[in-house]
């Protein structure tokens, strides 16, 4: 019967599927020390295979640079709760109550670019100024993209290399200062 042939074909096909092995699960972690997610990787393992720092040399570490994030926005924000993302050789973080995004050179602490959302009445009235303290990273069509949800309920997509709003993402926001692309109004 036709049903028997379909079932037999399915049985012949299933063994050819690639099934994740236990070894693959143990390969989780961050490639080349990158920390592309809040918890290091998509599984939130908080594990890095890097071994330059260990219990024997930890006490020998010295501060390489200092980056101040308390002066981003209309008033100082002394409670910086952001987990930086490390991808494509850059650190990405947010600072200030407006959640300004900065890309930093991890070797020097130099600011490579910064993105600030235009000031809006929605931000002024937001009860979320102390929440939403991070960014997300993804590769889209071969390039890095930084995503940010702000206290004013806008979702921004930024080119990870330049910090410019992502072309073709979102729709124009009818408020002063917003680019024609790169933003989604979440309200």
What do the PLM-derived regions correspond to, one by one?
Residues 3-19:
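Bacterial N-terminal signal peptides
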Residues 32-39, 77-96, 100, 126-154, ...:
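Repeat-blade elements of multi-bladed beta-propeller folds
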Residues 20-25:
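Boundary at the C-terminal end of the N-terminal hydrophobic targeting segment
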Residues 73-75, 97, 105:
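Hydrophobic small-molecule pocket/channel-lining residues, especially in calycin-type beta-barrels
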Residues 27-74, 110-124, 164-186:
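Aromatic (tryptophan-biased) beta-strands that constitute blades/sheets of beta-rich domains
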Residues 105-108, 160-162:
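Short loop/turn segments that connect beta-strands within beta-propeller blades
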Residues 53-56, 104, 158:
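Hydrophobic/aromatic beta-strand positions that recur at structurally equivalent sites within the blades
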Residues 102-106, 115-118, 137-138:
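Structural core of flavin- and non-heme-iron oxidoreductases
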């Amino acid at each position: 019967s036709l049903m028997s042939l379909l079932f037999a074909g399915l049985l012949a096909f299933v063994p050819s599927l690639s099934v994740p092995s236990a070894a693959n699960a143990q390969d989780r972690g961050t490639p080349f020390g990158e920390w592309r997610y809040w918890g290091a990787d998509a599984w939130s393992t908080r594990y890095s295979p890097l071994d330059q720092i260990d219990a024997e040399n930890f006490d020998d570490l010295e501060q390489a640079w200092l980056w101040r994030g308390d002066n981003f926005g209309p008033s100082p924000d002394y409670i910086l709760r952001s987990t930086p993302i490390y991808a494509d050789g850059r650190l990405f973080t947010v600072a200030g109550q407006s959640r300004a995004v900065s890309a930093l050179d991890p070797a020097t602490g130099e600011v490579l670019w910064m993105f600030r959302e235009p000031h809006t009445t929605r931000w002024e009235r937001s009860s979320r100024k102390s929440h939403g303290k991070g960014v997300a990273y993804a590769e889209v069509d071969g390039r890095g993209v930084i995503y940010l949800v702000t206290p004013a309920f806008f979702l921004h997509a930024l080119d990870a290399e330049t910090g410019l709003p992502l072309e073709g993402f979102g729709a124009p926001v009818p408020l002063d200062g917003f680019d024609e692309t790169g933003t989604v109004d979440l309200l």
